[in-house]
């Protein structure tokens, strides 16, 4: 249809501007002019429509005019209505508020954290106070001086005392040992374990350190209310602390029971081991 219109228009132009036969080049030139003229006209028309559409939309946004849903429109009005759809969608968005029934306990709360930290600090302060009272409490416990035979004595000590201090108090209960001032010459042996001097008795209490026969130091069983109670205690000998001179240990470490003694290692689990026994070791467990 377009081709027929172009031919008629070309024929009309050639008839008005020429006479007789027309060369092919003249025909093509006239046709090209017509096509260019139409393209320019179409481009101009499109630009005008776009400008009108933008102006109308801008005016509508500024004035806040809403398009009626029931209105019928045609042509450009319909296009403008379609262009307005995103705007109407924005208007329909609902405001999202807080839900008062939602659980927010898991969310960070500065005030709650401050209260909890204060409670923890108070609990820790109370616990430290209780532990200090335990450390300061004086207890009476039995001990054995071992030099091949076993002699039972008793001594007052506190859990906060170091093993070295504990040995010094034990030594003071035995007259012929008082003159020895060098504490490195004495060992504390508990359940076949040589306890280093730097450890506190409280360490074994609070950590419930296990030996080969249960608690390494069972202070609840060791504690006595009086010296008379110490004399009648029925605790197994291996559960009672032993004061031993280092010279005796070095001379007899190849024989029972010294051969089984070893230095205590806090990283080791002694509950997995068994206490050494020897039917010929009666002297080691015989009270005097």
From Swiss-Prot:
GO cellular component: chromatin; nucleus
Protein name, per record: FAM50 family protein C1020.12c
Swiss-Prot/TrEMBL keywords: Nucleus
Keyword Glycoprotein recorded: no
InterPro entries in the cross-refs: FAM50A/XAP5_C (IPR048337), XAP5 (IPR007005)
Subcellular locations according to the entry: Nucleus
GO biological process, one term: mRNA cis splicing, via spliceosome
Family: Belongs to the FAM50 family.
């Amino acid at each position: 249809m377009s081709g027929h219109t172009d031919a008629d228009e070309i024929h009309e132009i050639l008839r008005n501007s020429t006479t007789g036969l027309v060369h092919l080049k003249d025909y093509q030139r006239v046709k090209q002019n017509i096509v260019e003229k139409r393209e320019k006209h179409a481009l101009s028309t499109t630009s005008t429509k776009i400008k009108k559409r933008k102006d109308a939309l801008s005016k509508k946004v500024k004035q806040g005019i809403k398009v009626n849903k029931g209105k019928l429109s045609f042509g450009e009005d319909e296009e403008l209505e379609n262009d307005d759809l995103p705007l109407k969608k924005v208007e329909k968005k609902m405001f999202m508020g807080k839900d008062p029934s939602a659980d927010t306990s898991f969310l960070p709360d500065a005030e709650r954290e401050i209260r909890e930290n204060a409670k923890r600090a108070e609990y820790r302060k109370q616990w430290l106070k209780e532990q200090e009272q335990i450390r300061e409490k004086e207890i009476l416990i039995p001990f054995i001086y071992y030099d091949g035979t076993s002699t039972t004595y008793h001594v007052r000590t506190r859990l906060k005392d170091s093993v070295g201090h504990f040995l010094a108090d034990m030594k003071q209960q035995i007259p012929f040992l008082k003159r020895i001032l060098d504490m490195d010459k004495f060992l504390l042996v508990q359940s076949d374990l040589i306890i280093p001097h730097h450890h506190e008795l409280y360490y074994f209490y609070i950590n419930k350190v296990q030996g080969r026969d249960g608690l390494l130091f069972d202070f609840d069983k060791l504690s006595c209310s009086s010296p008379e109670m110490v004399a009648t205690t029925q605790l197994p000998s291996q559960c009672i602390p032993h004061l031993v001179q280092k010279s005796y240990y070095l001379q007899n470490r190849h024989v029972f029971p010294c051969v089984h003694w070893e230095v205590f290692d806090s990283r080791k689990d002694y509950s997995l081991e068994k206490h050494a026994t020897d039917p010929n070791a009666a002297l080691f467990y015989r009270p005097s």
